[in-house]
Curated annotation (Swiss-Prot):
This is Stage V sporulation protein AF. Belongs to the GerABKA family. It is found in: Cell membrane. The chain crosses the membrane at residues 296-316, 334-354, 363-383, 387-407, 418-438. It holds the Pfam family GerA. The keyword RNA-binding does not apply. It is a multi-pass membrane protein. The keyword Cell membrane applies. One of its GO terms (biological process) is spore germination. Keywords: Cell membrane, Membrane, Sporulation, Transmembrane, Transmembrane helix. One of its GO terms (cellular component) is plasma membrane.
């Protein structure tokens, strides 16, 4: 968030002025959740400012008991500030001299304790955000592996990452983004691995974000730090799995954690980062390689399968005699291109309906879509059976794509290729696919080539992409992130 140069107001020594400031600044007395508790200790007023719902109420009650107990002892009123400081039994207590920062901290869920005449506020971290416990992400499930996942609490997410990387060189830099929302955001990397230039680029991009609030959390941050424009391909990778995030941090990537989001942003990324899945690394290298190739085939099928089949329908002479069955077995009244688009649109309707349908009704909805709509549409001649079959196969290929954002981009590419094939036949397919590759090769994500290690070519890195190698054999980190320390394992191992 860019610096807005305004004169900071220091904490008043007069309690009445501090209370007036909070009434004017945050609407205390108007907003029901902004609270203040005033205590008289040793003939001086102590104010506790807090936000209902974001603080641990039990601790606030405990704190008030500790402060009131001071009256039961013979203490020097001139030493009240030191006495109060010693009574603040909490792991995180800091002194803040301005009311602006005090207000921001209170709105973040911390408690401010202001002693009359002190001229500063004690800020106590007793945040207790409402939220859920870590659980396995729905979109990144594995047969073997951890069952925890990121949640909407940045403190919990940082702890999940710290639990996996207990390295004293792991850095978690906290900042606030959003002029009004002041959303907490942290940048995570390992100091002696991550490229300092990459860290500087990410920090500068985040510091330059000038927006009212991060209502869409990490997605808003993404649109500011990378020049997405109308490019459908994802330029950063999202993950809800702490083990995946930790693995990328150890490779030299920079992770961005945004409060209120159950996903973290991995930067920088290439196309091949979006086609990897944690399941491949939970199986034997040979099995992991097999799963990876099956996934690659599904991703390619989701993009190219339908355009190629449609080309064979338009030009049956391209097929050898023993493969003529791939085409249409009978003519239909509706153009094939329209059938394909309608079937694809129907699958999108089904996907959107599944998202908004309660779990208890989703099975019934699937049966209605698959049996009633699909079967009846074929029987009445609206669709040919081949169209339903091949559109379904392409849809299954879409679902095998680990990255949801990449699957949508591939679907858009497929529709464009379909139109080009309908207009120009084989020339349209060749030209469209060539333009697609050139466009992807020209993309850069935080100065990282999108098609690396294919373009520019790096044989060793490409082998790591195509084959799931055993961990003892993966001794160096990917060169694309320019790590300060390329060795994954100690030199004496």
């Amino acid at each position: 968030m860019p610096d807005h140069k305004e004169e900071k107001i220091r904490v008043y020594r007069n309690p009445a002025k501090n209370e007036e400031y909070f009434k004017n600044r945050v609407g205390m007395g108007t907003s029901y959740d902004v609270g203040v508790r005033k205590l008289t200790i040793l003939d001086k007023e102590i104010q506790l400012y807090y936000l209902n719902g974001l603080c641990d109420t039990a601790y606030i009650i405990h704190l008030m008991r500790e402060l009131v107990a001071i009256n039961n002892r013979k203490e020097d009123p001139d030493e009240l500030v030191d006495i109060v400081e010693n009574r603040l039994l909490n792991a995180q207590v800091e002194k803040v001299k301005t009311l602006d920062e005090t207000t921001d901290q209170v709105l973040s869920g911390l408690v401010a304790v202001i002693v009359e005449g002190a001229g500063f506020a004690f800020i106590i971290d007793v945040r207790s955000y409402p939220g859920r416990n870590p659980e396995e992400p729905d979109t990144e499930k594995v047969v073997r592996g951890a069952r925890d996942g990121f949640v909407e609490n940045i403190v919990v997410n940082t702890a999940l990452l710290r639990r996996r990387i207990r390295d004293e060189r792991l850095r978690v830099k906290m900042t606030k983004v959003g002029e009004r929302s002041k959303t907490d955001l942290s940048i995570c990397y390992i100091e002696d691995i991550a490229d300092p230039d990459l860290v500087e680029i990410v920090e500068k991009e985040i510091a330059s974000i000038d927006v009212d609030g991060l209502t869409m959390a990490d997605k808003t941050v993404e649109e500011f730090i990378v020049n997405q424009s109308y490019n459908p391909f994802p330029l950063v990778r999202y993950t809800e799995r702490p083990d995946v995030a930790a693995n990328h941090v150890l490779e030299g990537h920079v992770i961005i954690i945004v409060d209120t989001s159950p996903s973290v942003i991995i930067t920088p990324t290439t196309l091949f980062h979006h086609v990897q899945h944690a399941e491949e690394y939970r199986q034997a290298p040979s099995v992991g390689t097999f799963l990876r190739w099956v996934r690659f085939f599904g991703i390619l099928a989701s993009t190219l399968f339908l355009p190629i089949w449609f080309l064979f329908v338009l030009q049956p002479d391209l097929l050898p005699d023993n493969m003529k069955f791939i085409g249409l077995n009978k003519d239909t009244h509706i153009p094939i291109i329209l059938q394909i688009f309608l079937a694809d649109l129907g699958i999108e309707f089904l996907r959107m309906a599944a998202i908004h349908t309660p779990t208890a009704l989703s099975t019934a909805m699937g049966l209605i879509a698959a049996v009633l709509i699909g079967q009846i549409a074929i029987e009445v001649g609206l669709f040919s059976p081949e169209v339903i079959l091949y559109v379904s196969l392409a849809a299954i290929g879409t679902f095998t794509t680990p990255s949801y954002e990449l699957s949508l981009a591939n679907k858009m590419s497929r529709l464009v290729l379909m139109i080009l094939v309908a207009l120009f036949h084989i020339k349209g397919l060749v030209i469209g696919f060539t333009v697609l590759i050139i466009a992807m090769a020209s993309i850069k994500s935080l100065q990282t080539p999108y098609l690396w290690p294919l373009i520019p070519f790096n044989g060793k890195a490409l082998w790591q992409v195509l084959v799931r190698t055993a961990k003892p054999g993966a001794k160096v980190r990917p060169s694309i992130v320019h790590p300060k320390n390329r060795l994954r394992q100690p030199t004496n191992s």
